[in-house]
């Protein structure tokens, strides 16, 4: 079964094509992405109206490239990110997916963007066993119990304020690194001393929920430190900030896996591309006897391939198509895999 999927939740226009085989395995056939990040950079963040217009302009050419790369003209299924995300951006992708599905006479599946991030990993590491999922991106930070990609996901905890990726962008802006800040801040942090400046670790006290995150206080602590120490090395500030984020994320994720008796930790989402997070996760998983799975960096960021993979797993588990009047949902919770 050939599944074509559209991703348009934020500032990447993605079209992915995957093959769901009879044995349940999923093979990637095409993964084409067009980004409007440069158009947003001068504003210091994503501008929803610009993102929506960029999707309108990029979707047709991106679709053509994906079909050509896969060597097909018509899939068996069309899927799309139906939420969560920016309202206007979602509308563009969902409307296009419905139109393609109707024109080709094939079923439409509106699926969860966050589930897609988890499902991207199967392209690199094969079928996903029961896992604890640490989902970290610009707008989301969740700890999840993933029994399988075809079953409802259980949320163990999330952030009470800023997402990890949001904190990265805000600190990068504070240090004058521009937008998007995650990759540039990561590169700067590698040249600094992560022990030179110790920033607070939010929600790690004895009375705090072990699976809940908070990064707003960390962001404020960095801002106050830079204001009080204008001569401080920005590389050391970046390294200290990054160490705080990676420390909290990995400690809570490893604890969740240990508490649940689950032997696999999956880290997914845009922040999963961060070098220190990956490094510290490897160290802590090895010490705890856990198997760590992290997609290649290209599959950590938004793309259509991940949506095709998640749709494939839902279909394999018996999910029925979404109606063509299914509405996009900017606030779709992570526990709801599909709008049916």
Curated annotation (Swiss-Prot):
Carries keyword Ribosomal protein? no
**One GO CC term, this protein:** cytoplasm
Which sites bind Fe cation?
113, 117, 302
Entry-linked PROSITE patterns: GLYCOPROTEASE (PS01016)
The enzyme's main class, written as a single word, is transferase
Indicate whether Transferase appears among the record's keywords: yes
Pfam families, A to Z: TsaD
Q: Which UniProt keywords apply?
A: Acyltransferase, Cytoplasm, Iron, Metal-binding, Transferase, tRNA processing
Q: Where is it mostly found? A: cytoplasm
Cellular localization per UniProt: Cytoplasm
Which GO BP annotation is one of this protein's?
A: tRNA threonylcarbamoyladenosine modification
Sites where the protein binds substrate: 135-139, 169, 182, 186, 274
Q: Which reaction does it catalyse?
A: L-threonylcarbamoyladenylate + adenosine(37) in tRNA = N(6)-L-threonylcarbamoyladenosine(37) in tRNA + AMP + H(+)
Q: Which cofactor does it need?
A: Fe(2+)
Single annotated GO MF: iron ion binding
For this chain's record, the cofactor binding note is: Binds 1 Fe(2+) ion per subunit.
Q: What does this protein do?
A: Required for the formation of a threonylcarbamoyl group on adenosine at position 37 (t(6)A37) in tRNAs that read codons beginning with adenine. Is involved in the transfer of the threonylcarbamoyl moiety of threonylcarbamoyl-AMP (TC-AMP) to the N6 group of A37, together with TsaE and TsaB. TsaD likely plays a direct catalytic role in this reaction.
Database matches in NCBIfam families: gcp_kae1, T6A_TsaD_YgjD
What PANTHER family would the database entry show?
Answer: TRNA N6-ADENOSINE THREONYLCARBAMOYLTRANSFERASE, TRNA N6-ADENOSINE THREONYLCARBAMOYLTRANSFERASE, MITOCHONDRIAL
What is the protein name stated in its UniProt record? tRNA N6-adenosine threonylcarbamoyltransferase
């Amino acid at each position: 079964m050939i599944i074509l999927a559209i991703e348009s939740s934020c500032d990447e226009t993605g079209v992915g094509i995957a093959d769901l085989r009879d044995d349940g395995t999923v093979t990637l056939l095409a993964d084409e992405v067009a980004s409007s990040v440069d158009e947003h950079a001068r504003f210091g963040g994503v501008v929803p109206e610009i993102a929506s217009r960029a999707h309108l302009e990029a979707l047709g050419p991106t679709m053509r490239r994906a079909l050509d790369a896969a060597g097909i003209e018509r899939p068996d299924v069309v899927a799309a990110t139906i939420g969560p995300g920016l309202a206007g951006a979602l509308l563009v992708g969902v409307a296009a997916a419905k139109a393609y599905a109707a024109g080709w006479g094939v079923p439409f599946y509106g699926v969860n963007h966050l589930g897609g991030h988890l499902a991207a990993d199967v392209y690199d590491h094969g079928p996903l066993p029961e896992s604890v999922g640490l989902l970290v991106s610009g707008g989301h930070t969740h700890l999840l119990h993933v029994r399988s990609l075809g079953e409802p996901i259980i949320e163990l905890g999330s952030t009470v304020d800023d997402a990890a990726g949001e904190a990265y962008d805000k600190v990068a802006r504070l240090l004058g690194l521009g937008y998007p800040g995650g990759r540039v801040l990561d590169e700067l942090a590698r040249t600094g001393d992560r022990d030179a400046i110790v920033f607070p670790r939010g929600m790690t006290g004895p009375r705090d929920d072990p699976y809940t995150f908070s990064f707003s206080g960390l962001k404020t602590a960095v801002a106050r430190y830079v204001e009080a120490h204008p001569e401080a090395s920005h590389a050391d500030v970046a390294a200290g900030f990054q160490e705080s984020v990676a420390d909290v994320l990995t400690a809570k994720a490893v604890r969740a896996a240990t508490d649940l008796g689950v032997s696999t930790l999956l880290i997914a989402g845009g922040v999963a591309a961060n070098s220190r997070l990956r490094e510290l996760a490897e160290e802590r998983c090895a010490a705890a006897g856990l198997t760590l799975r992290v997609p290649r960096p290209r599959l950590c960021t938004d793309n259509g391939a991940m949506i095709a993979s998640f749709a494939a797993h839902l279909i394999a588990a018996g999910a029925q198509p979404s109606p063509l009047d299914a509405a996009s949902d900017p606030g779709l919770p992570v526990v709801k895999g599909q709008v049916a």
